[in-house]
Swiss-Prot record:
Residues 2-146 form the N-acetyltransferase domain. The keyword Ion transport does not apply. SUPFAM superfamilies: Acyl-CoA N-acyltransferases (Nat). This is Uncharacterized N-acetyltransferase YitI. InterPro entries: Acyl_CoA_acyltransferase, GNAT_dom. It comes from Bacillus subtilis (strain 168). Gene3D superfamilies: 3.40.630.30. It is an enzyme of class 2 (transferase). GO terms for molecular function: N-acetyltransferase activity.
Length: 149
């Protein structure tokens, strides 16, 4: 059974490093936004084991017109659990939480090879693809949220 919980930023580092940035040090897996006011980190647990993580921070995106936006960063799921729907469960949980607090949009710099994953969750591409040196091709993706306010 999957369970989404708020976790500490420190709980994200091992999976960030292992899945997203194995060629970098743990220190390079720490983002400046991790401790920003309003930031939060979610984890999905399967039978008590942390299998998927993501971080969210208040951050505008110049290409978005929505006044209130959060950035998704460091989304990763352990290889052996990718068919469990942990990532989509986490994203849906975060979207609901953000919408309930009045956030109008959520966005990320998606790696090019996973843009279809986000599209299946209702996210849209924005702007042109770009390269992050040492990491690869990305595209900005976003979703407008239905706020309750």
């Amino acid at each position: 059974m999957l369970e989404v919980k708020t976790i500490s930023v420190e709980d994200t580092y091992e999976i960030r490093h292992r899945i997203l940035r194995p060629h970098q040090s743990i220190e390079q897996c720490k983002y400046k936004e991790d401790h920003a006011e309003g930031s939060f980190h979610l984890g999905v647990f399967y039978d008590g084991t942390l299998i998927s993580i993501a971080s969210f921070s208040p951050q505008s995106q110049p290409l978005l017109t929505e006044a209130s936006a959060y950035r998704l960063r460091g989304m990763a799921t352990l290889e052996g659990y990718r068919d469990q729907k942990a990532g989509s469960t986490l994203i849906k949980h975060a979207e609901h939480k953000l919408a309930e607090s009045g956030v109008q949009a959520v966005w990320c710099n998606a790696r090019h090879h996973v843009k279809g994953y986000y599209a299946k969750l209702g996210w849209k591409e924005l702007g042109e693809p770009f390269d992050i040196p040492g990491i690869g091709n990305h595209i900005v993706m976003y979703k407008t949220l239905r706020t309750s306010r």
